[in-house]
Amino acid sequence: MPEILNHTLILEKIKNLGASPGCYLWKSKKGEVLYVGKAKNLDKRVRSYLKENHPDVKTKVLQREIFDLDWIATGTEKEALILEATLIKKHNPRFNVRLKDDKKYPYICVSLSEPYPMVYVTRKLKDNGDRYFGPYSDVKSTRETLDIILRIFPVRKTRQVLPLPRPRRPCLNFDMGRCLGPCQGNIPVEDYKVIIDQVIQFLEGRKESLVSDLNIKMSNASERLDFEKAARYRDMLQRIQNFREKQTVVSLEGGDEDVIGFARKQDEGQVILLEIRGGRLETKKSFPIQGVLDAENSEILGAFFRDYYLNASLVPPCIFIPADIQDEVIPVIDVLQEKTGFRPKIKFPKGGDKRSLLKIAEKNAELGLSERLLATHYRDQTASLKEIQEMFSLERLPHIIECYDISHFQGSQPVASGVMFVEGKPFKQGYRKYNIRGYEGINDPGMIHEVISRRLQRIINEEGVFPDLIVIDGGLTQLTKACEAAVEAGAEGIPMVGLAKKREEIFFPGENEPFIFDMNSPGMKLLRHLRDEAHRFGVSHHRSRRNKETMRSLIQEVPDIGFKRSKLLLQHFSGEKKIEEATKEELLLVPGIGENLAEKILKQLQKKE
């Protein structure tokens, strides 16, 4: 039986499901909607979640949190698809793959519900006859598109209900020729509508037909000797041409297409959508995707396809996808056909120019994802450093933090490790290994004193940069000895703390009692990472040193080997590990090693095993 908290109650509920299409909602004990799904057959689909040893990792995790079930039956599978998208937007379930913050994606609105429509950016979609274009991936790109439109087309920019009871004074846009003055009643509604139709053509990507239309209108105006209107069309044509010259030609065939690229890493995904209109790359849209950790690529791309195209104002005749996900997108295509009256083609090119376009989109998705993860990491690390600064009352952010740890086996072969984190990340060039010189046996505080003394003295001698914080892996005794070393070196101003493993206690100089901070806070997570890295590095160095000394003693115990030939062996094989793996023939290649001695070496190595 799978790990479902309320298994019996859910089985009772399933009895009433039936075989109709619809949507199901898995809920937690607190009533949180965990996952929304659609099904052609609700009963069959929901029962699939009750299987033991489910092959899907994400479903196994979901099973452990399921407590309740809700469902909504629909008349058709298409209705279930539309309802699924609506429910995911409403509840934002954490087990669903979804567009990140998709409720906030901006659109460009053409307010056709007004006699003199405006063109503006909005996030609110109203069912009042206005036309919406989008969604765009961010406000910046949306405003850039809007600015281009407002430079090309002389539409009104001020938000007020027109026509006004009485004409107002013309604004600066009218004086500059960027508006035709509908607020003054200078342009009839019919003439203004012609300009709005041109804006819509532009937003729909039909720029070739728009240019052709404007050329005809300019010629007709010239023939009528309406030179003012002809000049206006000429200026619009010039601005459109300037805009088009900046666009990259990606297809000599022309045509309207969308090209989808995808990248993923950890629990984050990124989709890049290249909008090609009239053979030119018109827009690059970038969409972060959430909840991709254990999801298949087909599920992720299918979810994007659903969330984007069911809300898109325009769907091109052809869409190129980076994987064969026909099964996932066919229900969406069916709905789009009902909405638009045509069925877009979905293609998965395996070669040629279209495959090259897909690779461009995929490369852009990889770059966009890397940039986003880097920004997130930097933001998280900065938060961690700020918290550490507050925890330890530091004068400045701890840009450089060092941590020191002692490793030995019952006091033998003692070593120390020092690791350095810069801006919250490991800085491997700053890592240091130390063989303890002045202490034998178990004396961790004394060894810490030696290592800190050596480290600080080296910084002073080389005129280096002191760290902003030193963390000692240990308790109050080790920390006290480290502080003594700093005072002796004349570097007592460096902040130091001790981090004990037992309860993750923090010790401060001069304070007998430790402090305990929130284990899951960003600052403590970074400090534990630092301490664990110092421990790992120290254990690795200690193991290496112990193995070397063990090997040297083993070789020196070989009868008749002597110091000189031991040294030749180590030099020839460049290390002890290769001596362990050597054959008799390989040993004979070492100067001074004959058959008799080679056999003695092999026997000695066998004793070790």
UniProtKB/Swiss-Prot annotation:
It is found in: Cytoplasm. It comes from the Bacteria. Residues 208-243 form the UVR domain. Residues 19-97 form the GIY-YIG domain. InterPro entries: GIY-YIG_endonuc (IPR000305), GIY-YIG_endonuc_sf (IPR035901), GIY-YIG_UvrC_Cho (IPR047296), Hlx-hairpin-Hlx_DNA-bd_motif (IPR003583), RuvA_2-like (IPR010994), UVR_dom (IPR001943), UVR_dom_sf (IPR036876), UvrABC_protein_C (IPR050066). CDD domains: GIY-YIG_UvrC_Cho. Pfam families: GIY-YIG (PF01541), HHH_5 (PF14520), UVR (PF02151), UvrC_RNaseH (PF22920), UvrC_RNaseH_dom (PF08459). GO terms for cellular component: cytoplasm; excinuclease repair complex. GO terms for biological process: nucleotide-excision repair; SOS response. SMART domains: GIYc, HhH1. GO terms for molecular function: DNA binding; excinuclease ABC activity. Its main location: cytoplasm. Keywords: Cytoplasm, DNA damage, DNA excision, DNA repair, Excision nuclease, SOS response. Interacts with UvrB in an incision complex. The UvrABC repair system catalyzes the recognition and processing of DNA lesions. UvrC both incises the 5' and 3' sides of the lesion. The N-terminal half is responsible for the 3' incision and the C-terminal half is responsible for the 5' incision. Belongs to the UvrC family. HAMAP family: UvrC (MF_00203). This is UvrABC system protein C. It comes from Leptospira interrogans serogroup Icterohaemorrhagiae serovar copenhageni (strain Fiocruz L1-130).
